[in-house]
Amino acid sequence: MPPSGLRLLPLLLPLLRLLVLTPGRPAAGLSTCKTIDMELVKRKRIEAIRGQILSKLRLSSPPSQGEVPPVPLPEAVLALYNSTRDRVAGESAEPEPEPEADYYAKEVTRVLMVENTNKIYEKVKKSPHSIYMLFNTSELREAVPEPVLLSRAELRLLRLKLKAEQHVELYQKYSNDSWRYLSNRLLAPSDTPEWLSFDVTGVVRQWLSHGGEVEGFRLSAHCSCDSKDNTLQVDINGFSSSRRGDLATIHGMNRPFLLLMATPLERAQHLHSSRQRRALDTNYCFSSTEKNCCVRQLYIDFRKDLGWKWIHEPKGYHANFCLGPCPYIWSLDTQYSKVLALYNQHNPGASAAPCCVPQALEPLPIVYYVGRKPKVEQLSNMIVRSCKCS
């Protein structure tokens, strides 16, 4: 036997004994993953989440607990948080790895439509079958200084009761009173209000790059060739002038707005620096009596588990983690057996076998205080929704 074979012999003896003791069975389901105590796994996961949240917010330590004002959240901040939470709830998780720019938390900003009583609407050539929503681009640029920082932009409208089904179309304000078609939506009859959302990320990026002082959208009824009536039947919150007092204030707050998610400028400066991606549970493989790799529920209470009072909303969330066996086949007659043996020799704490890891993750919107100022941000990849063997 050559010298290299003698050096590998001690590594192969345990596997040979296993094959001799179990004749007639393939070497399937073998794993070098370590058995981890469940409570230890949960504690490690909680500590990883603690570091992940601070890292995504670019904080070296939690803000002072005494800085949190003991008062209810302002209505505008709460409305912004609820809009962000509802949007996340309506989206499916992205299983692909996030780009480097998506690692850090996104600052969420709400830019309200200019009230329809403003004189700037007089400059727009109107149609009786449409509603018009104008925005000051100066407010957009204040929220997002550079177009490249914008991650997503949505136009959100609160649709009130609708008696009959209607097909509507959204247009972008173009040059010389012309309008460019963007998308359409078929609205079903409903007795309850409903938020409508349109992805306008590309349009807002254009406005940030070379837009005018005022830009906007038009919502119109779909005009089919065989229909004589193209009246817009949809009642959108913010376009009725019959309300007074506090009701008018609430009505105005829920008028159409742009929901912007962008990387803050100070965080963007770190995007080009080299860093090692943080990943939860990469140092551990799990095995249990479960039949398959699966999602295990883990609820994080910010006060109880992390000792934090500075995150105002939510009070906690289901972070979850992945757990379960990942069977694989490793036989002695494969050309990779020596490579795997050497890998284990040089990486005794690692596993050459596939392990149960997150596949689909979802973001987490939060409201937290910086001094006495509340902020709404979205933390990417915080909730495990599905797992895979990798």
Swiss-Prot record:
InterPro entries linked: Cystine-knot_cytokine, TGF-b_C, TGF-b_propeptide, TGF-beta, TGF-beta-rel, TGFb1, TGFb_CS
Signal sequence segment: 1-29
GO BP terms, alphabetized: ATP biosynthetic process; cell-cell junction organization; cellular response to transforming growth factor beta stimulus; chondrocyte differentiation; epithelial to mesenchymal transition; extracellular matrix assembly; extrinsic apoptotic signaling pathway; hematopoietic progenitor cell differentiation
UniProt GO cellular component terms: blood microparticle; cell surface; cytoplasm; extracellular space; nucleus
Site (Cleavage): 278-279
Superkingdom of the organism of origin: Eukaryota
Key words of the record: Cleavage on pair of basic residues, Disulfide bond, Extracellular matrix, Glycoprotein, Growth factor, Mitogen, Secreted, Signal
Renumbered residue ranges of the record's region Bowtie tail: 226-252
Function recorded in the entry: Transforming growth factor beta-1 proprotein: Precursor of the Latency-associated peptide (LAP) and Transforming growth factor beta-1 (TGF-beta-1) chains, which constitute the regulatory and active subunit of TGF-beta-1, respectively.
Family note: Belongs to the TGF-beta family.
Protein known as: Transforming growth factor beta-1 proprotein
Gene giving rise to this polypeptide: TGFB1
